[in-house]
């Protein structure tokens, strides 16, 4: 299996409910290592850049507002097939459709407030990681 990295965000709905430790425990129990982590307040510019792929979607403005509404925790996760593994651990975007035991099934409030973001490919993970971390920030 290939060791790879993926990017994660614990969103404002999760940090507001003090779920960082609980979500980190799920991540680590799944065999992923947290090799970089930082709690930040995402700026509007950062959120717009990060979610630029959704700029033409009707929910874009709401998404940017939500992601800047409170602290988030940005993370780099590492492990065997980390991108696919973390997407499995997160669960479906809609928590009502997420599998039992997944982060979104356990902690998400709604489709919009679904607690976590995870990269959808290794290529996007590298781009997303670089928006928030330098290689020196990532310690294995």
Curated annotation (Swiss-Prot):
InterPro entries: NDK-like_dom (IPR034907), NDK-like_dom_sf (IPR036850), Nucleoside_diP_kinase (IPR001564). Homotetramer. Its cofactor is Mg(2+). GO terms for cellular component: cytoplasm. This is Nucleoside diphosphate kinase. It catalyses: a 2'-deoxyribonucleoside 5'-diphosphate + ATP = a 2'-deoxyribonucleoside 5'-triphosphate + ADP; a ribonucleoside 5'-diphosphate + ATP = a ribonucleoside 5'-triphosphate + ADP. Belongs to the NDK family. Major role in the synthesis of nucleoside triphosphates other than ATP. The ATP gamma phosphate is transferred to the NDP beta phosphate via a ping-pong mechanism, using a phosphorylated active-site intermediate. PROSITE patterns: NDPK_LIKE (PS51374). GO terms for molecular function: ATP binding; metal ion binding; nucleoside diphosphate kinase activity. It is found in: Cytoplasm. SUPFAM superfamilies: Nucleoside diphosphate kinase, NDK (SSF54919). One of its GO terms (biological process) is UTP biosynthetic process. Its main location: cytoplasm. The keyword Nucleotide-binding applies. Its EC number is 2.7.4.6. The active site is at 117 (pros-phosphohistidine intermediate). ATP binds at residues 11, 59, 87, 93, 104, 114. It comes from Methylobacterium sp. (strain 4-46). It holds the Pfam family NDK. The keyword Kinase applies. Keywords: ATP-binding, Cytoplasm, Kinase, Magnesium, Metal-binding, Nucleotide metabolism, Nucleotide-binding, Phosphoprotein, Transferase.
């Amino acid at each position: 299996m290939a060791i790879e990295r993926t990017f994660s965000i614990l969103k404002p709905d999760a940090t507001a409910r003090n779920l960082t430790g609980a979500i980190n425990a799920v991540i680590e129990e799944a065999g992923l290592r947290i090799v970089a982590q930082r709690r930040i307040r995402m700026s509007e510019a950062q959120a717009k850049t990060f979610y630029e792929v959704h700029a033409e979607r009707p929910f874009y403005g709401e998404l940017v507002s939500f992601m800047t509404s409170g602290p988030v925790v940005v993370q780099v996760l590492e492990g065997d097939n980390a991108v696919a593994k973390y997407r499995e651990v997160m669960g479906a975007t809609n928590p009502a459709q997420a599998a039992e035991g997944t982060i979104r099934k356990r902690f998400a409030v709604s489709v919009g407030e679904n607690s976590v973001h995870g990269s959808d490919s290794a290529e996007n993970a590298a781009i997303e990681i670089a928006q928030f971390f330098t290689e020196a920030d990532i310690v294995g």
